[in-house]
Amino acid sequence: LSFPALPFFTAGLRPELFAGAGTQSAHRVLLVTALSVLVLAGFAFRANGLSSEGLSDDELNKLSAVNEYRTQGLTSANGEHPLLMKALLTVSVIAAEKWNQTSLVAGHPELNVPVETSLRFPVALFGAFAAVLIYLVAAELFGLETGLIAAALWAFDPLAIGFNRIAKEDTFLIFFFLLANFFWLRGQRVAESQPERNPERFYWATAAAFGAMLASKYVPMLIAITVSYNYAFQRIPVTRWVIGKKRFLKFFFVMGVVFLICNPTILLPGTWKAMSNFTSYRNMAHDSYEFMGGLYPHRFQDWFRGEPWYFYFALIATKLPVLSLFSFGLGLGLLFRRKSGDGRYFLLLWFSLWALSFMIPGGKFTRYLTSVLPAILITAAIGVQFAARRLGRLCARVFENESLKVYARAALASLVIISAFWSAARAAPHYRLYMSVLGGGHAKAGAYFPQDEFYDAYMQDVMIEIAKRARPDARVAGELPSLASYYAQRANRPDLACVEFSDPQELEKLVPGDFLIDARGRTYLNNQVMLARLRQVSQPVLTISVGSVPAAYVYVLDQTSLAALRGELQNRER
């Protein structure tokens, strides 16, 4: 962390804020070693205990798509999402199955790779390597020290780790976005400071990375961040970083070709039908989202009637380690100082355009923060570096020893990084349940964003316990019938009929001795009254926890609880 920063050139300003860092390059071996340690340590956090939590309903949809690809070839399965991630998941699942069939695993069953692990492994891998891309982007904008601090914060941040341990598209989205912008910013550097070189190869590499990004998740607005950053320099007379219309046309052509190569299922009619159903909410199973104890409509067009605009502010305030949060606040203020250099415009555009796209719509999920979390951590790294330099100068002045500067700077940066490491270590392996002291600590785990914090992690254990107790052909009611059925099959109880209890027809079919799952985060506007009535007249026979946090309550239904669910008790009282 005491490495001097790289020289920095953009179309305008040099970041005077960190000018004291010097312009020598760090020893390449030391730099590669530092990044390798961060990637390996970050991967260890992300990959350890991947099967400690059961699959979510979303992840089961991915597994179903993988199985369909294997039996039928490329289809429109899970077609509302692009192919690239599902293709990587398919490779991982097949590789794990081949591994599990080896004689080595036969003799050592503990080496067997569960499907939960194989499905999530590619996400964990890409999430760990994203630390390198964060370093590269931050180093281009603000220098080597900021890049290393930002990479370390990503490697050990509980939020980042939690998002990188679920089989969803957001990690791949941000990976390719970062890759694209590293090429884009390197092209800027070449255009401005090395006129003898042609920067075009960096533009085409950017376009290719964006094609892969869109083949990971359909979030084209992120491209606007990159293009807007270039546009911000076009009115500067001396700028050399000019793309031009012809090159932009070629840029989007390259992006489109790579997109089609990585996502050929976009050409299937069934894919467009699935996307239409998704965007029109015809496949939307649930009508709301629980946030801080309240239920909110959850559609995109609910706008300010949906989840509150401060949803992501609450997430950052309660889930970032305290020192990382304070560093982010300091760094955010520094982004409005001219001395921070032109790189600050990239982060400001990132924050602004992301906020317009994700904070105003009514439908929000915590994992959407993944696409702006690197910007938050880079900003935090700016704050750490600024404070560390101030501390270094203070120590040198107080003790009249210039050599103390380096040690003081390294000590403060290390303190912030170690605090993130410690937070992640304490939260393992249930990182999504991490709560900072400002959020109320572990006592408040699962209280603010229960659907995303638990993410159905309890369902495997729930069905194992029900399978032990249920009579033949019993019905199991809950809000996740497909997932319950999957784990019932895994528990050798294919006879169990798993149904959605908020469906009036299925509710009428329940009889005494059937089971009902009341899971945290799965209370909705259409079932909250029924669950409230059930809780008043009955007690769960089982409580399933994720770690030490109660996550789901299992009821064995009797005549009284069935009458409460159906509202018959209230009708009698009237």
PLM-predicted stretches and their roles:
Residues S56-D57, L159, R165-F172:
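Short acidic/glycine- and proline-prone juxtamembrane loop motifs at membrane-interface regions
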Residues F45, A65-N67, H81, A87-L88, ...:
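Transmembrane-lumen/periplasm boundary regions of multi-pass, lipid-linked membrane glycan transferases
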Residues V113, T117, F121-L141, L179, ...:
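Transmembrane-helix motifs of polytopic, lipid-linked glycan transferases
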Residues A139-L141, E145, A180-Y203, M213, ...:
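Membrane-interface transmembrane helices that cradle and orient dolichyl/undecaprenyl
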Residues L133, F172-E192, A205, A209-F210, ...:
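Specific aromatic-rich, kink-prone transmembrane helix
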Residues V39-G42, A150-A155, G162, F182, ...:
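Short helix- or helix-capping micro-motifs
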Residues A497-R574:
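Aromatic/acidic, Gly/Pro-rich catalytic loop(s) in extracytoplasmic/lumenal soluble domains
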Residues Q101-E110, I134-F156, F175, Q194-R197, ...:
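Transmembrane-helix signature of polytopic, membrane-embedded enzymes
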